[in-house]
Amino acid sequence: MGRKWANIVAKKTAKDGATSKVYAKFGVEIYAAAKQGEPDPESNSSLKFVIERAKQAQVPKHVIDKAIDKAKGGGDETFVQGRYEGFGPNGSMVIAETLTSNVNRTIANVRTTFHKNGGNIGAAGAVSYMFDNTGVIVFEGTDPDHIFEILLDAEVDVRDVTEEEGNIVVYTEPTDLHKGIAALKAAGITEFSTTELEMIAQSEVELSPEDLEIFEGLVDALEDDDDVQKVYHNVANL
């Protein structure tokens, strides 16, 4: 799964570069998680997980605290999750996951983004069947066999464990992501660079330079949308 690891790193690096956009999107996600349960990460596991991911993305404490305080203060915005799927040039596929307080606005914006950037939006399920929802855990290490044994002993449903560039990369069934994190923490591993649910393409395509430029414009435009939280695709050379 080396290629998949490379794509995850590339996507994470690109997002980390646009810091203000990353902070704002995590702020929305933290607020939404806090509103759905208690605004206390110790009693709200969803909120705790989002905060951990925000810290991995270097989101400052004041941004996290502001989002939680807004939820505590009785903010009346309600956010709804969504997923939009579509196609780019030459067999390229893209999934955009959204979190929005205005679904009609988001649908209109996403449709327009596809249309203006050489893509075609599809129906629900049009491309997601070609992706596997996967738990991904990344941390420093060089002994994947040992990590696999730890997870196996904890009865975590693991798809793969690899070593990539001095990091251990664990791929789990989506339902076992939190179980895998807990097992690793129990084994003394406490620092993670990634703990995410990712949609990983079952197969990938390589685009020509011309098609790649079009597709990159589509992905960038989707990621620039304030309502879009994550973008997944199947292009190997992006």
UniProtKB/Swiss-Prot annotation:
Enumerate the InterPro entries for this protein: Integrase-like_N, TACO1_YebC-like_2nd/3rd_dom, TACO1_YebC_N, Transcrip_reg_TACO1-like, Transcrip_reg_TACO1-like_dom3, Transcrip_reg_TACO1_YeeN, YebC-like
Location within or outside the cell: Cytoplasm
Gene Ontology BP terms = regulation of DNA-templated transcription
Name recorded for this polypeptide: Probable transcriptional regulatory protein llmg_0242
Q: Which GO terms describe its molecular function?
A: DNA binding
Query: Which Gene3D superfamilies does its entry note?
Result: 1.10.10.200, 3.30.70.980
Q: From which source organism is this entry?
A: Lactococcus lactis subsp. cremoris (strain MG1363)
Q: Where is this chain primarily localised?
A: cytoplasm
Q: Where are the transmembrane segments?
A: none
User: Which UniProt keyword terms apply here?
Assistant: Cytoplasm, DNA-binding, Transcription, Transcription regulation
